Amino acid sequence: MEFLEAIKLPFTGLRAAILATVLTVAAAAAVPAAAEDNPLGLIDPATISVGTMGDAKPYAFTTSDGNFTGFDIELFLNVAERIGFKKDQVIFTGQEFAALMPSVANSRFDVAAAAIGTTEKRKETVDFSDGYIAGYLSVLTADASITDAAGLKGKRLGVVQGTLQEIYAEKNFTGADLVKFPDNNSAVAALNNATVNAHFLDYEAAKDYSSRYPELKIAINIPSFGAPAGFVVRKGNDALREALNKALHAAMQDGTWKTLHEKWFPGTPMPEAYLPKP
């Protein structure tokens, strides 16, 4: 009996050693396989999850049937198709603006797309694709006394939390009383109810609201060409960022970007940097 046990032990040890070796080899082989199966570092390699907004017209907003549309949405769908993803493989989810970049950083979304301006501060926590649009920051108001920055002194000025407008206003409109909102719709509702005197937002969005509410006028326009909007990706996900850049520049070069800009921003000048090159 003791002899038999002595015989079994070496074979048991040998089997264990072989099993351990097989598992080690399998684990090592699994790493490159996983990378090959998910070259863009996506949360789910079969889809691209995109955080966006439902009220940032004409960039990103929801239609009456609950679908997302807008310049950013259509541009991203075109870019995604160029890197191999069909429309039904791109999953859009609406959020408040302030939550978009943290959600990408924390791997809730692969990308955020909502006319998000590129700044050095934001690049500390997330990465950006190359820029795809730039324009103006605007003050929307029904108050005829507001015609310049000085006219905002002592006024209640709405801003959407986390936006370039909030950053700019805190630095440059120090005499105004800033009131922070989760989105433009709630801020404009407050403006229409005279809870705030003015709202600071993107020019194209301001133009849309002023067309819907004729009493609201665009009183101030401030250039923001130094912070063009880009698609937000997780910090260090260079594979996805570079793929987006390649597809984005292809969309610019073949005129897709121009067509979408003309559709969503009729009459607005187009920066030459985004137009086809000879």
For each predicted feature, which ranges?
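Acidic, polar ligand-binding/catalytic clefts
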Residues: 77, 90-151, 217, 222-223
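Bacterial N-terminal signal peptides
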Residues: 16-28
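Extended ligand-binding regions for polar small-molecule ligands
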Residues: 73-83, 155-156, 161-164, 230-268
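Ligand-binding clefts/hinges and TM-proximal coupling segments of bilobed small-molecule sensing domains
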Residues: 37-38, 167-181, 217-220, 248-278
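Periplasmic-binding protein-like
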Residues: 54, 133-140, 203, 207-248, ...
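Extracytoplasmic small-molecule ligand-binding "clamshell" domains
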Residues: 36-114
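A ligand-binding cleft/hinge motif common to bilobed small-molecule-binding domains
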Residues: 99, 114-124, 168-171, 192-225
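Bilobed "Venus flytrap"/periplasmic-binding protein-like clamshell domains
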Residues: 50, 54-57, 66-83, 117, ...
